[in-house]
Amino acid sequence: MGKFTSFLKRAGSATKKALTSDAAKRMYKMAGKTLQKVVESEVGSAAIDGVMQGTIQSIIQGENLGAQFKQAVILNVAGTLESAPDPLNPGEQHIIINVSEIERAEKEDRVIETHNKKIIERFGGHLLKIRKIMKGEAEAEQLEGKEMMQVEKALKGMLRIGKDQSERITRLYRALQTEEDLRTSDETRMISEYREKFEALKQAIELEQQATHGEAVQEMLDLSAEVIETAAEEVPVFGAGRANVVATTRAIQGGLKLKEIIDKLTGIDLSHLKVADIHPHIIEKAMQSDKIPDNRLAMAIKSKVEVIDEMNTETEHVYDPSCLIVKKEYEKHDNKYHVNIPSALKIHSEHTPKVHIYTTPWDSDKVFICRCIAPHHQQRSFMIGFDLEIEFVFYEDTSVEGHIKHGGAVSIEGRGFRQAYSEFMNAAWSMPSTPELHKEKMQRSLGSHPIYMGSMDYTVSYEQLVSNEMKLVYDTDLQMHCLRGPLKIPKGTLMNALLFAVKVA
């Protein structure tokens, strides 16, 4: 468990802090006239930063502030419908989620209709029966008394589809790690096919970046549907088809309505089981101008395998203990569905494995807190708080609340969310740089519980989420890019950096 605090770095923001710092004033006196000239020069802001970091020599030699800014791109693709809205705007969140779900449902229906026979051959016809039940195409009487059987079929189907995807991508990962002379003909063909997709993704990103100004944070790469769909499935389930009906694992699983029937009949919400269509590490490699060797591309592929395996482990965790609990609930009602069953197995929405967003009751526009909860089987969480008024960030690993999804006792490691939130508030208002009015509002907020603003799904592994967060805490170059623009923009950029990471080229 860990706890870290830091000041965010905004270009030019260090000048005021440095000039008013007693320690800095002593440094200036010791440095003499040379430093005074630098401080008074046009690059004063960069010079002050250089003094505090011990790099005044580079400033004196003429390095300017603009040179610190490079092209920064959020490692996400617009066409994948996974953008992060303003964390403090629930209305915007709701609209984006609804639009994304409508577009995704249309895409999933096309995939199921096109690859109907192949899905039956590979995963079994019983999964298509579940889809018909959920779409109202089958009579309700077919489900009565067989609810538990359908739940088990859906969970087994999810696991089978997930493991099939893991096996396919793992074969590609291992093939990329194998010496070229030792590869089989199938491995060579698999790598050749994936290289074609990767090069198409790489070229599309290069064209997109050419239109991006060097001093802008590109919110997201806007690529064509053809590039996204083909690159999203590293090793095709059934082989490539027309661009608008490429059968991705995510589309098959969503189109079969497996999560929906589990939620409807048991109250078990599995909406957090999502994998990025194109993993941020693959986008990062595609952004590089040089040719990517097989071993480096293999490590990017491995990142996606880790997410898939994490989701499969979570499905197994739900299947083993939760099915026993569900069966007991059904036995209480003669093995038939009853409206009380889902409510008995529901957990509080703030305890689900997502990124939960909070703000303070006062000065809400300047402060937001994210509580990131790991999949249920990991029993982990962390909190990261941002105070944009004083450019302060606070991180702490936190314990999770015990509930029915954990399937037993919960090990308590570290403090709870409320204690971590209180320390963040205490630390923020007690900083010497905190304006008096902001300090009063933070003190007032300290006595109240934070306001819940909603949640967002993350599509990378929990470990990757922690890694993204640590970069936000320590990487000053990244912070300068994330904190540019009016207040609304930094909030959205920070959320995107947390969920997907940002590449500073």
UniProtKB/Swiss-Prot annotation:
Protein's GO biological process = symbiont entry into host cell via permeabilization of host membrane
Q: Which UniProt keywords apply?
A: Capsid protein, Outer capsid protein, Viral penetration into host cytoplasm, Viral penetration via permeabilization of host membrane, Virion, Virus entry into host cell
**Entry-linked Pfam families:** Orbi_VP5 (PF00901)
- CC annotations in GO: viral outer capsid
Q: Which domain of life is it from?
A: Viruses
What Gene Ontology molecular function terms does this protein carry? structural molecule activity
> Where is the region Involved in membrane permeabilization?
1-42
Q: Which InterPro entries match?
A: Capsid_VP5_Orbivir
Q: Where in the cell is it found?
A: Virion
Described by its record, this protein's role is as follows: VP5 protein is one of the two proteins (with VP2) which constitute the virus particle outer capsid. Acts as a membrane permeabilization protein that mediates release of viral particles from endosomal compartments into the cytoplasm. Permeabilization activity is probably negatively regulated by VP2 and is triggered by endosomal degradation of VP2 and exposure to low pH.
Give the record's family classification: Belongs to the orbivirus VP5 family.
Question: What is the name of the protein in this document?
Answer: Outer capsid protein VP5
Organism for this UniProt entry: African horse sickness virus 9
Name the lineage.
Viruses, Riboviria, Orthornavirae, Duplornaviricota, Resentoviricetes
